[in-house]
Regions:
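Short, electropositive alpha-helical surface patch
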Residues: 202-204, 234-249
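Active-site-proximal loop/helix segment associated with metal-binding centers of metalloenzymes
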Residues: 108-200
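Short, solvent-exposed loop/turn segments at secondary-structure junctions
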Residues: 13, 43, 192-195, 231
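Beta-strand-turn-beta hairpins that frame and shape the catalytic cleft
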Residues: 1-4, 103-114, 183, 234-238
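Structural motif
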Residues: 3-5, 33-36, 183-187, 223
Length: 250
């Protein structure tokens, strides 16, 4: 069994071709390809997304992902939920699984704590509500201005950030594990790491929660995406984007 981790795909899975990544040859269903958020394959509904998801299902490996901030959370939450390797998942396809927030999985002999989500940083000019009476006028005005905005329920969902119940479940599961896991998988970074990524990133409730995890939890590696860079910070925080990295198993 092997485990590989990559960063944001945003619905583009071409990195998972043997032409782009020859190491895919010889993989099987016991091998796992993990996407560190902004999966983007569940976005416009099965009629639009289905072909790409079926293509991914046909790959020889099992695809696992945590949510990022650019996901259609309404559609994602509608997929069947079940237990898998000790934690809860949404089954997008039999071998395409969403690792839900606050869970601890055992994969490849390693324990993995998962906490997807992030606060969008491309909404400086606001969130438009399609139900507002002046929506269409505001939408086209902002488009002409090249404004940084998104549309509620179409390109932005408040569920990009965890709920209080998800925070509570995460903490309870870490308590049961004695605040010790092998790996942590998130989309965004803990607050204490943000200045080392880029100075303009500001803490928020999720990054603050992850900072608590960083300080309290014993772990070997922390994998994340979100920042569109490939970097390793402090020897343990592996930021992924287009790169695919193999995880060393114990």
């Amino acid at each position: 069994m092997g485990i590989w981790v990559t960063g944001d795909t945003h619905g583009d899975f071409q990195r998972f071709t043997t032409r782009n990544y020859p190491q895919l040859k010889g993989m099987d269903r016991n091998d796992c390809m993990i996407i560190a958020g902004d999966f983007g394959g569940v976005w416009a509904g099965e009629q639009t997304d289905g072909r790409k998801l079926d293509w991914l299902e046909d790959k020889p490996f099992t695809t696992l992902f945590v949510c990022g901030n650019h996901e259609n959370f309404g559609l994602l939450s509608a997929y069947p939920e079940r237990e898998w390797h000790g934690g809860r998942v949404h089954v997008v396809r039999p071998h395409v699984l969403h690792l839900m927030r606050g869970q601890i999985f055992e994969i490849g002999g390693l324990t993995w704590f998962t906490m997807g989500g992030a606060a969008s940083h491309d909404i400086q000019d606001g969130i438009l509500d399609p139900a507002a009476p002046n929506f269409e006028r505001r939408y086209w005005t902002m488009r002409r201005m090249n404004a940084m905005f998104r549309v509620l329920g179409h390109s932005w969902w408040p569920e990009e950030m965890p709920s209080e119940a998800e925070y509570a479940e995460a903490e309870a599961n870490l308590e049961r594990a004695g605040w010790q896991v092998n790996c942590i998988l998130t989309h965004c970074a803990p607050s204490g790491i943000l200045p080392q990524i880029e100075l303009h990133y500001r803490p928020d409730p999720l990054t603050d929660f992850l900072e608590t995890v960083r300080q309290r939890c014993r772990f070997s590696s922390w994998f994340l995406g979100h920042y569109h860079t490939n970097r390793i910070i402090d020897g343990r925080f592996v930021i992924q984007w287009g790169q695919i990295s193999k995880v060393e198993l114990m």
